């Protein structure tokens, strides 16, 4: 009796799993195109980002006034410089200021790659690997620029260039290791990361240097 129940449970589990797979397979093309478009839109919004749009951003409470034709809201929307209007200005402002700065544009390329891989049904193992590479490169770039911002602290060097992630992590590292130490660790991390990408054998390199 117990064996029969376990077989029924296993059968239902496989049936539900196959339904999920068939749904994804059936709509794979649609999902891939949607993801590709989202990535392309994200890239365009970041490319056309300007701090000037910050003063023209419509708050959540004002979104409803767009439909009622509020004059002040309409003027804000007309002064928006982003190529994708209010939505592009809002998305780019969040990504640039609250993630990796201008390096967050790589998030758009990640979405495009996901869309292409799904569309052509390619091996997703490589896709996951390169997604990690691009995310880590975005983080390291943000960290490097955050170090430059905090060490040199010029007014021309805006915080948007590194984002809050790079600025925060760089601040912690500078407090722990000093400016020179933080920059050294960041640059070494870059070299090790690039070595992994091109598959450098660091042991062989060390041996050849020793010889």
Q: Where does each model-flagged region fall?
A:
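Alpha-helical transmembrane segments used as membrane anchors
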Residues: 1-211
């Amino acid at each position: 009796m117990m064996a029969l129940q376990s077989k029924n449970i296993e059968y239902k589990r496989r049936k539900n799993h196959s339904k999920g797979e068939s749904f994804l397979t059936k709509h794979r093309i649609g999902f891939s195109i949607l993801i590709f478009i989202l990535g392309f839109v994200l890239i365009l919004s970041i490319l056309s980002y300007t701090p000037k749009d910050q003063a023209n951003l419509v708050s959540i409470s004002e979104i409803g006034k767009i439909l009622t034709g509020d004059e002040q809201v309409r003027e804000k929307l007309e002064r928006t410089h982003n190529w994708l209007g209010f939505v592009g200005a809002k998305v780019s402002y969040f990504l640039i200021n609250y993630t990796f700065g201008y390096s967050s544009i790589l998030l758009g390329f990640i979405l495009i790659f996901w869309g292409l891989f799904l569309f052509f049904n390619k091996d997703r193992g490589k896709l996951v690997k390169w997604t990690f590479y691009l995310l880590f490169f975005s983080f390291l770039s943000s960290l490097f620029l955050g170090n430059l911002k905090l060490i040199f602290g010029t007014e021309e060097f805006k915080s948007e260039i590194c984002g809050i992630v790079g600025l925060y992590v760089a601040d912690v590292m500078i407090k722990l290791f000093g400016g020179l130490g933080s920059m050294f660790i960041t640059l070494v991390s870059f070299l090790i990361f690039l070595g992994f990408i091109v598959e450098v054998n660091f042991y062989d390199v060390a041996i050849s240097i020793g010889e």
